[in-house]
Amino acid sequence: MAKEIYRRYMWLTDTIRSAKNGITFEQISSKWQRCSLNIKGEELPKRTFRNWLNSLPTALGVVVECDKKAPFRYRIANREIERNDLLEWSLNAMALGNIISESNDIHDRIMVDDIPTANETLRIICSAMRNCHMIWMHYQPFDTDYDYSFNTKPYAVKLSGNRWYLIAHSDSHNRDFCYGLDRILEVKELEETFQMPKDYSAQEKFKYSIGIYAGEQLPIEEVKLKVSGYLQDYMETLPLHWSQRVVERDEKSTTYGYTMRCTYELVDKLTGLGSFCQVLEPLSLRQQVRENALKIAEIYK
């Protein structure tokens, strides 16, 4: 029951935030009648609507305001929630789920990428994170023939490249390690507790990198990419990194600037963009991408 109520809160939040100019109760009720969560297609009682609104600040941290004059449109008051990546991702995922549910008659024409399932593993890890409990896990890496078991401190989880990853801290190595959830054979939440460092921030850890490798030992550098062709529009609508900015633009190309760490994941990403992306700076990154390109060219000789 609690899960269903939470989904309704998510639906209401997404419905209101999607209305750029606000939305009336009548419009919300009409959308609710067509919503996949409303199996019987009933109208939304105003009392229920009020209860949902009153619960949003506690449940999701969302505050809704209403215009003081007709037609009394509702809108999100604290737009800063859009900077909450987890809430934003959850709302988008739920909205997509509703769209697919309402389009069952064309389900064979709606395609999504497969994400390795690790729901139970993710649930156990998130529970341990909330409780600051150690976890025991049995792990099988991709690059070895053996598996091993150990205790560790679950600090954070991250979704990257259609895979969930655990960032966990090892006291014996005095560093964080990254584990693919689909490679965890078994995981248990332990009673043993740990203290999260007061200054730890997963967002800050990955602030200057892409993917799952933070590369904190690498310097933060200014990166310049010269992008041409279709890739200009693509990167304009889906930036490579939050620090992306336009440095120069002409009829044929756009030069973007970034503040990043030049990790191996960045090198691989830029190599994959092919001839439409040229690294201008730094020289070391340009050389790494060049070496990758030469290796690929050698394969296809």
Locate each region found by the language model:
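Bulky hydrophobic/aromatic content
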Residues: F25, N54, L60-G61, E65-P141
